[in-house]
């Protein structure tokens, strides 16, 4: 009699559930980011956010590869992903913006409040993506926005303006880019994302003592990613095959 029958081990279920664990690990990375931000170690916080962004980028393709929805139909990967995204894309960046004193009181409370409330409402929008996989409205990527404000050492006026405009755009039917899933200009979009990430990593290595040329290039690449969705929306033939 065999003590262990390997044929009875639910390998498919174990493999699928491990993807959920990978996604959920983003919550611990966010916790480490909260600890760092509370101690004003913002460079460390953004490294943790960057790692969380990496996890967020790879868990979806892996989930589709191992057919997580089919194997584990009672576990919602989408719900789990939204929970982690809200913490890492919204809550932690809003906390960092407040902790940094970049805007100053009492407007820092107002800015953080606008970020977290508008983003919570956005996540409830069932029509946040278009047929071309653009996001409809600013897709609450506050981790990228707040990081950019840190890199450029934004003034209180600039930071508050960027926050206010982005919150306003959250509820407008203006397209924003999903750099991986949108097919139009995809090679260029991915190149700009790579440049943005490389320059962002360089800024962290420099502890935000970043040369002017790098700041300009970083902000320019960020503006491209921020605006290209709307440009492609108003010029539907641009980049179309």
UniProtKB/Swiss-Prot annotation:
It is an enzyme of class 2 (transferase). One of its GO terms (cellular component) is plasma membrane. Its main location: membrane. Belongs to the CDP-alcohol phosphatidyltransferase class-I family. Its EC number is 2.7.8.24. Its cofactor is Mn(2+). It comes from Agrobacterium fabrum (strain C58 / ATCC 33970). It catalyses: a CDP-1,2-diacyl-sn-glycerol + choline = a 1,2-diacyl-sn-glycero-3-phosphocholine + CMP + H(+). Residues 1-15, 63-76, 122-133, 181-187, 236-241 are cytoplasmic. NCBIfam families: PhCholSynAgro (NF045884). Keywords: Cell inner membrane, Cell membrane, Lipid biosynthesis, Lipid metabolism, Manganese, Membrane, Phospholipid biosynthesis, Phospholipid metabolism, Transferase, Transmembrane, Transmembrane helix. One of its GO terms (molecular function) is identical protein binding. It is found in: Cell inner membrane. It is a multi-pass membrane protein. The chain crosses the membrane at residues 16-36, 42-62, 77-97, 101-121, 134-154, 160-180, 188-208, 215-235. This is Phosphatidylcholine synthase. The keyword Hydrolase does not apply. Residues 37-41, 98-100, 155-159, 209-214 are periplasmic. InterPro entries: CDP-OH_PTrfase_TM_dom, PcS. One of its GO terms (biological process) is phospholipid biosynthetic process. It comes from the Bacteria. Condenses choline with CDP-diglyceride to produce phosphatidylcholine and CMP. Affects motility, biofilm formation and virulence of this bacterium when there is a complete loss of phosphatidylcholine formation due to absence of both the synthase (pcs) and the methylation (pmtA) pathways.
